[in-house]
Amino acid sequence: DGFQFNMSCGYNLEGIKDKKIDDFIEGMKDARDTEIFRECRTWLLEHVDLFEHVTREDIEAIPSEICNSITLSTMHGCPPQEIENIVMYLLREKHINTYVKCNPTLLGYEFVRKAMDDLGYDYMAFTDFHFKDDLQYEDAVPMLRRLKEVAAQEGLSFGVKLTNTFPVDIKRQELPGEEMYMSGKALFPLSITVAARLAESFDGELPMSF
């Protein structure tokens, strides 16, 4: 009651259609024919005497429908059309409730740079590259509207997950490489601002996951 499993998938349509991933999605939607579900159910039934508050009837009543929702994790730079194609596939072909993880770059370089500076994170180094390469806000809103309509037609739920991490430059050898991903406290004001803007654009009618 009130507990929801959620799958995560990415990063391109070709990969999601791969048999291994497809089997995983279908197995989570209904696990009754999967080896692991049968194995676990059999073990529980054979060891019901180990439980104080679980009966054989409780075990037999465990549903095989494990998960009916999925979140699309989009890499930075994922083309808008690829995002839309994947969600269309998940809604129409897989018939599963779908959420899209959005990037904080939707806010634009100038806003994010000023926000980081004003909040004491001026040491965060980044250029406008990802802001130009990622999905733009003016493209995101109409795309999300289309996907929301398709979900309604399919009798499914559609929304956004906020937000993905934010790529910043490695300047002090914090990690190997050239780029790392910002999360935690510094990301929160960006995520909540994306939420506020989308809520305004959709009159509060766009489901959001955090």
Task: Name each model-derived stretch.
Residues D1, K29, L45-E52, I70-L72, ...:
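Catalytic cores of nucleic-acid editing and processing enzymes
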Residues G2-F37, C67-L72, N97-K101, G155-K161, ...:
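Structural preference for beta-strand elements that scaffold enzyme active sites
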Residues E46-C67, R113-A115:
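A short mid-domain helix/strand-loop element embedded in enzyme catalytic domains
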Residues G108-L206:
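Glycine/Thr-rich beta-alpha phosphate-binding loop at enzyme active sites
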Residues C78-H95, Y99-V112, D133-Y137:
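Extended, H/D-rich, highly charged conserved domains that either
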Residues L50-D58, I83-L91, L147-A151, S191-A199:
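Structured alpha-helical segments in the cores of large, soluble enzyme domains
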Residues S69-P80, K132-Q136, P207-F210:
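Active-site mouth loops of central-metabolism enzymes
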Residues R56-E82, R92:
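Active-site periphery "cap/insert" segments of enzyme catalytic domains
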